[in-house]
């Protein structure tokens, strides 16, 4: 329960966001050059040792903005959700940077597509946050399909805000594709 979180807080280590925010001073943005590093993210190491990949500010920002408009057809003001691991380059880019650069609201979610508490977690999030664009991996929907093959949990939620579903990161198997086509 939420009250349990407060019981586990430790003085001197854990800070209350609202308290800290109320005493914070505004800070001006720091200008950077387009070629300055934005972040370093390490690859998985599937082809050997993990390698640090450095993204620059300008090029990455342009690519993210372009993809939001031309690939995802997102409009400023839309709600975009990438249900991915923020440590993966796609999750990092489409949770943190792309939606905000394009003027969208981004949804940050901690949990699995099933058993949090049930296979309706994705549908519940779409309804609650009026999500317009949803991006995840096929594995997530394979898990949902396994737990809820008849999409009974979907029927509990209004997902009419959803304009697009995008899947990437691995092969989308035909049974999962067909299941999604049939329920959506």
Description of each model-found segment:
Residues 85:
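Residue(s) in the substrate-gating loop at a strand-loop-helix junction
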Residues 1-4, 61:
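Positively charged, low-complexity/disordered segments
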Residues 91-107:
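Conserved short alpha-helical elements in the N-terminal third of ANL/AMP-binding
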Residues 3-15, 76-77, 102, 110-184:
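Conserved adenylate-forming
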Residues 11-15, 21-42, 49, 59-64, ...:
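Conserved pre-ATP/AMP-binding loop-to-beta segment of ANL
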Residues 37, 43-46, 68, 80, ...:
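Conserved S/T- and glycine-rich ATP-binding loop of Class I adenylate-forming
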